[in-house]
């Protein structure tokens, strides 16, 4: 009789060995040198009852610091936002949860329509013409946007703001290492925004694209209109890495002439967990549609006139063109894209706007409380993040804050020595006045 977790009897094993012409398990591994074979049983404890095992696992899990046990002011790309309850209920349906790339439209209409709706929502938020079905994360989307710019313009220089997420810049440099001819020029900051004079001076006729973040990594809102004016006559592309929740309130990049808008939909329905998985989005203009990486779902009609959805423009993709594909991305984040679509749909246009307003209001309240406490808060018009200077190392402050069940902000000294002892603080719609007041009070005590 087989074990409940190991569904093989000795008879099963013998039948399998006989089928492949081996006399024993040892003969099966005969090609493996004997000195690296483990010639004993694994040192594994005996099995436990499920109730006992659950108690043990819960005891281990209780050691974790989570946003359920602590109040989080940590952002830097991953945020603690409200997710409607309907999100988990919908994405747990088996037809979505287990679905793979819907190559066969006749049996994948639900999945295809869900992706189509995601693309539509992204286009509406960004004010762009076309969006793909998703990317791995915002960093991947950004790097792919830069590669598209090189390909489209046939130029080799890209000008990027140091206000971009430092990990997005790292991914770009990793991509660029495989293309020796590509030059990445990083523009310094003026406070917490891009130094526009240096940016303007760096843009020339050899520039493939200019890339900025909106709001940027330090929480400040860049002047997209001014930046776009620097590149209008240079035939360079304008790439904007944007927080999609902020676009519920801020003027979308497409309205400022952006050619490609990328980002991460984590703020919509995707929990903050271990650094992933996330869901990158990629939106662009009709002119660049045939160079978009990843899947595109289009709306069509069948031979009976019924509306249907299919994967379209597949000649761009690596399963068709191999080494000549616009990108090597294959599987995407369709389940997380669905989660974001459901969250956006449940909130609606007004709901997204209201939450965006709450983020600004709560962050501004927190700013004022830090200023009243005597902290230096760096200037800059912000959305839901801002930078505060401390007298003590941020790591030390954060270690002490945890004792009060508070997860402090991001240590910017990790990114640059210019921001040593500076904390990037995120304040979302979920943070209450009492939570903010307690955070500021404890931060003040620890900074003395």
UniProtKB/Swiss-Prot annotation:
<comment type="similarity">
    <text>Belongs to the GcvP family. N-terminal subunit subfamily.</text>
</comment>
<dbReference type="GO" id="GO:0019464">
    <property type="term" value="P:glycine decarboxylation via glycine cleavage system"/>
</dbReference>
<dbReference type="InterPro" id="IPR015421">
    <property type="entry name" value="PyrdxlP-dep_Trfase_major"/>
</dbReference>
<comment type="function">
    <text>The glycine cleavage system catalyzes the degradation of glycine. The P protein binds the alpha-amino group of glycine through its pyridoxal phosphate cofactor; CO(2) is released and the remaining methylamine moiety is then transferred to the lipoamide cofactor of the H protein.</text>
</comment>
<protein>
    <recommendedName>
        <fullName>Probable glycine dehydrogenase (decarboxylating) subunit 1</fullName>
        <ecNumber>1.4.4.2</ecNumber>
    </recommendedName>
</protein>
<dbReference type="InterPro" id="IPR020581">
    <property type="entry name" value="GDC_P"/>
</dbReference>
<dbReference type="Pfam" id="PF02347">
    <property type="entry name" value="GDC-P"/>
</dbReference>
<dbReference type="InterPro" id="IPR015422">
    <property type="entry name" value="PyrdxlP-dep_Trfase_small"/>
</dbReference>
<dbReference type="GO" id="GO:0009116">
    <property type="term" value="P:nucleoside metabolic process"/>
</dbReference>
<dbReference type="GO" id="GO:0004375">
    <property type="term" value="F:glycine dehydrogenase (decarboxylating) activity"/>
</dbReference>
<dbReference type="InterPro" id="IPR049315">
    <property type="entry name" value="GDC-P_N"/>
</dbReference>
<comment type="subunit">
    <text>The glycine cleavage system is composed of four proteins: P, T, L and H. In this organism, the P 'protein' is a heterodimer of two subunits.</text>
</comment>
<dbReference type="InterPro" id="IPR015424">
    <property type="entry name" value="PyrdxlP-dep_Trfase"/>
</dbReference>
<keyword id="KW-0560">Oxidoreductase</keyword>
<dbReference type="InterPro" id="IPR023010">
    <property type="entry name" value="GcvPA"/>
</dbReference>
